[in-house]
Structure formats: C-alpha cells, structure tokens
Amino acid sequence: MHGLQFGLSQAQTNYWIHRLLPVLQQTLVAIEMTPERDGESVATNRETSEGGANLAIAGTERRLQRPLDPVRQREKYSGKKKAHTDKNILLVNEHTKKVIYLSATVEGKKHDNRAAKEAAIVYPKNATLAKDTGFQGYEPEGVLTSQPKKREG
C-alpha cells in the first residue's frame, strides 16, 4: 500500500522503508517522542501526568499473512477480527494526545484485558483511566476507571 501512493514497486518500497526506519527511530528519540516500553516505568514518566493523569487504554491489532504452521495459526487467529493478527496495548495521555506506553507485541488471540494485566503497567497516583469494553474487569489498583455504557435501543 505504501508503494502504490508513490508509484514504487514492492522491492523499492521495502528498500526505502528499511533505509528510512532507523532515521525515523533516531529522530523520535531525539525529540523525546518514543513511548515507554516498560510498564513499570509509566508512573515515573513525566508525560504521563502532563495536564493531569487522564489516560486512555486501547488494544490495537494488525493483520498478518496467515501462518503456514497450524499451531501458529491458532495463536495468531483473532476471533474478534476474524483474521490472523498481532496485538499491542497502548496507553495515551488524553490531554496531550501522546502515546505514553506501547506494550510488547502479543498474539492476536489474547484478549485485551489479559494482555493489559500481563503488561503489568504501573499507573501514577490519582490517575483516571478511560477504557473500552475489551478491558471490562481490568481495574488497576489506585486508578479511577471509566467505561462507556452501551446505548439502549
């Protein structure tokens, strides 16, 4: 898809992605825009509390090519997306709209709630956390959580 927008072949697109990705990563580090990758460091990150510790948690999935190995197929298959996927958990500061935390990649069949618990995210004191229905039952200690109610009708 990236190559189609610029009239590049798959080989050219692959070359440029691998050539420019390290530059992008270095730039993000230089301007301090990389998210935490360690759940225990979230509470001490200054950007977490910027504008108040109003945070939102979300699970994000991206499609994969179907694995050939039947065992890997079962691990990667997401019933929610009806496809083979990988998943990450994101934590966003609702005030600054910055991604504060990006979890390790997990298999698509793992539920958002379980992936968040396994990430062992440590939240700052008096934080508020907005979550969707995928995190029902996820109640981190010392955090005020809110979940939207389903509309009736």
Language-model region placement:
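Short, well-ordered secondary-structure "scaffold" segments embedded in the functional core
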Residues: 1-153
